């Protein structure tokens, strides 16, 4: 049985902490800061950090990797096509990696960065996805390195995962993403309800994650490029008709960048 908790870092990052409660072994995903993990380990000295999973090379995801590796000897698993500090296992599309007895499938999801990967497993009772900065709750990452032609299919691929899949993304951006989703689909009742729910959570300083793939299909405009109203809003933003899913996505992303 794997338990997953969030260790907050910086202003809005989450370092995901996976725990095998029977064996008292743990793993972390995207430790941009070693501090929160060190403090958790100090408070739980009987636990061993066995693995560090990395989705991409940005410093707010890898800044704590080398220190944690030096302190614990944990295995560092990260994308093969990016510079990851202390990486022991280079991962690419189709690879599998066993962590705490759970086998994760590696999915290449370029766009935010060119070598970005996600980790998916359907072994637990509830499938789980660590999506890094590719898929956010009600949103997606900026394209710092990739293109719409890369990122839209990557997101569509994640959207095709089982609807009950729990989505663990790396930032608490949900409320701002939902404000944009409301602008794109002002009559979508699922967006409105989610906005109200998340507003209550954040008012109490509570985490809005994990999401689910099913909820993202209903409320995330970047996964809804085939919806008539979403396309109409994208067309209005660009001032012309967007004839492909990629074009609609690109219009939405450029709109969100200035929203």
UniProtKB/Swiss-Prot annotation:
<dbReference type="GO" id="GO:0019243">
    <property type="term" value="P:methylglyoxal catabolic process to D-lactate via S-lactoyl-glutathione"/>
</dbReference>
<dbReference type="InterPro" id="IPR001279">
    <property type="entry name" value="Metallo-B-lactamas"/>
</dbReference>
<feature type="binding site">
    <location>
        <position position="133"/>
    </location>
    <ligand>
        <name>Zn(2+) 2</name>
    </ligand>
</feature>
<comment type="subunit">
    <text>Monomer.</text>
</comment>
<comment type="function">
    <text>Thiolesterase that catalyzes the hydrolysis of S-D-lactoyl-glutathione to form glutathione and D-lactic acid.</text>
</comment>
<keyword id="KW-0479">Metal-binding</keyword>
<dbReference type="InterPro" id="IPR032282">
    <property type="entry name" value="HAGH_C"/>
</dbReference>
<dbReference type="InterPro" id="IPR036866">
    <property type="entry name" value="RibonucZ/Hydroxyglut_hydro"/>
</dbReference>
<keyword id="KW-0378">Hydrolase</keyword>
<dbReference type="Pfam" id="PF00753">
    <property type="entry name" value="Lactamase_B"/>
</dbReference>
<dbReference type="InterPro" id="IPR050110">
    <property type="entry name" value="Glyoxalase_II_hydrolase"/>
</dbReference>
<dbReference type="GO" id="GO:0046872">
    <property type="term" value="F:metal ion binding"/>
</dbReference>
<dbReference type="InterPro" id="IPR035680">
    <property type="entry name" value="Clx_II_MBL"/>
</dbReference>
<comment type="pathway">
    <text>Secondary metabolite metabolism; methylglyoxal degradation; (R)-lactate from methylglyoxal: step 2/2.</text>
</comment>
<feature type="binding site">
    <location>
        <position position="112"/>
    </location>
    <ligand>
        <name>Zn(2+) 1</name>
    </ligand>
</feature>
<comment type="similarity">
    <text>Belongs to the metallo-beta-lactamase superfamily. Glyoxalase II family.</text>
</comment>
<keyword id="KW-0862">Zinc</keyword>
<protein>
    <recommendedName>
        <fullName>Hydroxyacylglutathione hydrolase</fullName>
        <ecNumber>3.1.2.6</ecNumber>
    </recommendedName>
</protein>
<feature type="binding site">
    <location>
        <position position="60"/>
    </location>
    <ligand>
        <name>Zn(2+) 2</name>
    </ligand>
</feature>
<feature type="binding site">
    <location>
        <position position="61"/>
    </location>
    <ligand>
        <name>Zn(2+) 2</name>
    </ligand>
</feature>
<feature type="binding site">
    <location>
        <position position="171"/>
    </location>
    <ligand>
        <name>Zn(2+) 2</name>
    </ligand>
</feature>
<dbReference type="InterPro" id="IPR017782">
    <property type="entry name" value="Hydroxyacylglutathione_Hdrlase"/>
</dbReference>
<feature type="binding site">
    <location>
        <position position="133"/>
    </location>
    <ligand>
        <name>Zn(2+) 1</name>
    </ligand>
</feature>
<dbReference type="GO" id="GO:0004416">
    <property type="term" value="F:hydroxyacylglutathione hydrolase activity"/>
</dbReference>
<feature type="binding site">
    <location>
        <position position="56"/>
    </location>
    <ligand>
        <name>Zn(2+) 1</name>
    </ligand>
</feature>
<dbReference type="Pfam" id="PF16123">
    <property type="entry name" value="HAGH_C"/>
</dbReference>
<feature type="binding site">
    <location>
        <position position="58"/>
    </location>
    <ligand>
        <name>Zn(2+) 1</name>
    </ligand>
</feature>
């Amino acid at each position: 049985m794997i338990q997953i908790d969030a260790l907050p870092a910086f202003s809005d990052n989450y370092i995901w902490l996976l725990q095998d409660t029977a064996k008292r072994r743990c793993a972390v995903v995207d430790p941009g800061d070693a501090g929160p993990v060190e403090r958790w380990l100090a408070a739980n000295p009987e636990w061993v950090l066995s693995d560090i999973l990395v989705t991409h090379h940005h410093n707010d995801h890898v800044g704590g990797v080398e220190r944690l590796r030096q302190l614990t000897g944990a295995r560092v698993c990260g994308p093969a096509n990016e510079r990851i500090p202390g990486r022991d296992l280079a991962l690419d599309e189709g690879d599998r990696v066993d962590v705490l007895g759970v086998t994760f499938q590696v999915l290449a999801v370029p766009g935010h960065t060119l070598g970005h990967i996600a980790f998916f497993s359907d072994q637990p009772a509830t499938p789980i996805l660590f999506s890094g900065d590719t898929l956010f709750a009600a949103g997606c990452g900026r394209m710092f390195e990739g293109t719409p032609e890369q990122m839209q299919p990557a997101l569509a691929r994640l959207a095709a995962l089982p609807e009950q899949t729990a989505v663990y993304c790396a930032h608490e951006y949900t409320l701002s993403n939902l404000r944009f989703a409301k602008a794109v689909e002002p009559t979508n009742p699922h967006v409105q309800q989610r906005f109200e729910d998340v507003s209550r959570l954040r008012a109490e300083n509570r985490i809005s994650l994990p999401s689910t793939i099913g909820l993202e299909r209903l409320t995330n405009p970047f996964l809804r490029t085939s919806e008539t109203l979403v396309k109409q809003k994208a067309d209005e933003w660009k001032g012309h008709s967007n004839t492909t899913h990629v074009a609609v996505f690109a219009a939405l992303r450029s709109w969100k960048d200035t929203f």
